[in-house]
Amino acid sequence: MARRGRPKRRKVCFFTANKITHIDYKDVDLLKRFISERGKILPRRVTGTSAKYQRKLTVAIKRARQVALLPYVNDVN
């Protein structure tokens, strides 16, 4: 049984839309938008970021984790 309705709207890259060219690993509030409640990096298909910025985002999140600005894992109880 196929579900009908409106076609899905294409997600827009947050960084392209806001003209952000540099993703700083010290900007924790921005990075938290792209991390799940468990602490995992959200995939492109969920966030809508372009491939270029997803790569930059991944590097920034990993750097922030290494200097203890972000946790590797969030314990949700």
Swiss-Prot record:
A GO MF term: structural constituent of ribosome
Gene Ontology biological process terms from the UniProt entry: translation
Coiled-coil blocks: none
Source domain of life: Bacteria
Family matches, as InterPro entries: Ribosomal_bS18 (IPR001648), Ribosomal_bS18_CS (IPR018275), Ribosomal_bS18_sf (IPR036870)
GO CC list: cytosolic small ribosomal subunit
Assigned keywords, A-Z: Ribonucleoprotein, Ribosomal protein, RNA-binding, rRNA-binding
Pfam short name (any one): Ribosomal_S18
Signal peptide: none
Family (UniProt): Belongs to the bacterial ribosomal protein bS18 family.
Record NCBIfam families: S18
Subunit structure of this chain's protein: Part of the 30S ribosomal subunit. Forms a tight heterodimer with protein bS6.
Database matches in PANTHER family: 30S RIBOSOMAL PROTEIN S18, SMALL RIBOSOMAL SUBUNIT PROTEIN BS18M
Function: Binds as a heterodimer with protein bS6 to the central domain of the 16S rRNA, where it helps stabilize the platform of the 30S subunit.
Name of the molecule in the record: Small ribosomal subunit protein bS18
